[in-house]
């Protein structure tokens, strides 16, 4: 079977299409402890350090709410570690992030290893050792990624329990879970927690945990009593946060144990953000609202994501001396 046909078979065999909202139900009482983390972005060493810190048992549950891949150097290793843990009997659930969705879209509709997301995932994989992207074996590559494609295609976009909801980017609290739009749960930057006063009965009394939007001070952000943002910006802060939801204990690991993040950085970042991309983002959001095509919306959202990454990199470079201040 030639490369193109084989690739189509791999994607057709997956049960879940990525343009549908899949919701997985859980019962929190089935687990002793429930840990939640997000947006690891290829920071494999931080992930291992966090696993060591939380000392995950088979009676526990680990929920990763999206964006293992891209930006960092060891995305593939994290996926492999997760799969190994599952095979060893650990309870690990993964929610698709926008970067996984981009990865699947590009792998399905184009040749692999063409864009940054694919490269970031597979650059350290067995069949892709040549960094210039010129020499890789298509058939061997497909054999290697088949398990990952099937796993990701069957991951949910939302996990809902009796007391908690987990989602990558956010929710529209005016819509029930089954009516959420893929664009919202994967990409939104809206401050949806401000909509609590109009939320539906489905959300009352439930905690919501989300990632996607990094907290620049490297800490889990309590938006309301029930809504928490847990993306600590690991790909550029080198801080990874995790919360055990039953005890509400927050756990943090750092690449450098002597790094601290002054609270002023959050304010500084917002000033740079407004200066660099506010006008651009506003214009692009207008385009999104004026487009009926879902494909065109995703293209614009990808463009926004690339622009955000540029700003974050510029921010880190400009203020790196503040990041390395000794405690």
Regions found by a protein language model. Give the residues of each.
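Active-site neighborhood of divalent metal-dependent phosphoester bond hydrolases
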Residues: 71-160, 188, 192-198
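Active-site neighborhood of phospho(di)ester-bond hydrolases with catalytic His/Asp-centered motifs
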Residues: 37-38, 63-66, 93-98, 167, ...
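Active-site environment of divalent metal-dependent phosphoester hydrolases
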Residues: 41-46, 70-73, 100-104, 173-174, ...
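Basic, mixed-charge low-complexity alpha-helical segments
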Residues: 285-295, 299-321, 325
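A short acidic-Thr-Gly-centered motif at the start of a beta-strand
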Residues: 22-30, 55, 86-87, 157-160, ...
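Conserved beta-sheet core of the metallophosphoesterase superfamily
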Residues: 186-254
